[in-house]
């Protein structure tokens, strides 16, 4: 897919020319990430997971139009994670759109060991407590000691696993049955780790 890729953005050209070799450099450049191929090149070990496929219907003059809405998460299980949604009249294109959008929303999770029960100084957990919200859903992630695992609902667990966080407690409020909001709230909580407390 990336062999015949012709970059359209400045960041894409820098990556294609080999001037930017890592995802860290790409994000530090502050150039907008608008091409999923950039992520494919810089993070070849990226995995994706479809969290939800739902049907959305809309009434038009010609009748009822049905589309599929897909929510997907991507991550390399080593600090990078992104989430995205995609809509299309067929399932396969909707999945591809969601995965591409997730790649464009990728960021680096700041990992650490913020658990008072552990204090090993490793990067198996989070450096401090973080909270994220989306719609009615509020997710709080708390650093856990080594060996705890991910204590979270299924959707949040899949997002956290792909981010490469191994030990964490979580508390949720709101309609966690709404997969999109549950996933986005978890994503927003992880994003807060970028703003490290000094």
Swiss-Prot record:
Keywords: Ribonucleoprotein, Ribosomal protein, RNA-binding, rRNA-binding. InterPro entries: Ribosomal_Su5_D2-typ_SF, Ribosomal_uS5, Ribosomal_uS5_arc, Ribosomal_uS5_C, Ribosomal_uS5_euk/arc, Ribosomal_uS5_N, Ribosomal_uS5_N_CS, Ribsml_uS5_D2-typ_fold_subgr. The keyword Metal-binding does not apply. The keyword Acetylation does not apply. Gene3D superfamilies: 3.30.160.20, 3.30.230.10. Residues 46-109 form the S5 DRBM domain. One of its GO terms (biological process) is translation. One of its GO terms (cellular component) is cytosolic small ribosomal subunit. One of its GO terms (molecular function) is structural constituent of ribosome. It comes from the Archaea. Pfam families: Ribosomal_S5 (PF00333), Ribosomal_S5_C (PF03719). With S4 and S12 plays an important role in translational accuracy. The N-terminal domain interacts with the head of the 30S subunit; the C-terminal domain interacts with the body and contacts protein S4. The interaction surface between S4 and S5 is involved in control of translational fidelity. NCBIfam families: PRK04044.1 (NF003125), uS5_euk_arch (TIGR01020). Belongs to the universal ribosomal protein uS5 family. Part of the 30S ribosomal subunit. Contacts protein S4. PANTHER family: 40S RIBOSOMAL PROTEIN S2, RIBOSOMAL S SUBUNIT. This is Small ribosomal subunit protein uS5. It comes from Archaeoglobus fulgidus (strain ATCC 49558 / DSM 4304 / JCM 9628 / NBRC 100126 / VC-16).
């Amino acid at each position: 897919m990336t062999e015949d890729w012709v970059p359209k953005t400045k960041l894409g050209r820098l990556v294609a020319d080999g001037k930017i070799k890592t995802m860290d450099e790409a994000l530090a450049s502050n150039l907008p990430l608008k091409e999923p191929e950039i992520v494919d090149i810089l993070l070849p070990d990226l995995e994706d997971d479809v969290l939800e496929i739902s049907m959305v219907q809309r009434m038009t003059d010609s009748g009822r139009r049905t589309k599929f809405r897909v929510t997907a998460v991507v991550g390399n299980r080593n600090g990078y994670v992104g989430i995205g949604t995609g809509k299309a009249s067929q399932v396969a294109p909707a999945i591809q759109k969601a995965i591409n959008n997730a790649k464009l929303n990728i960021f680096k999770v700041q990992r650490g060991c913020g658990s008072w029960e552990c204090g090993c100084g490793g990067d198996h957990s989070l450096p401090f407590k973080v909270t994220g919200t989306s719609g009615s859903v509020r997710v709080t992630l708390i650093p856990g000691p080594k060996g705890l695992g991910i204590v979270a609902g299924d959707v949040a667990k899949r997002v956290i696993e792909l981010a490469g966080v191994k030990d964490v407690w979580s508390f949720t409020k709101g309609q966690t049955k709404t997969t999109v909001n549950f996933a986005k709230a978890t994503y927003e909580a992880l994003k807060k780790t970028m703003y490290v407390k000094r």
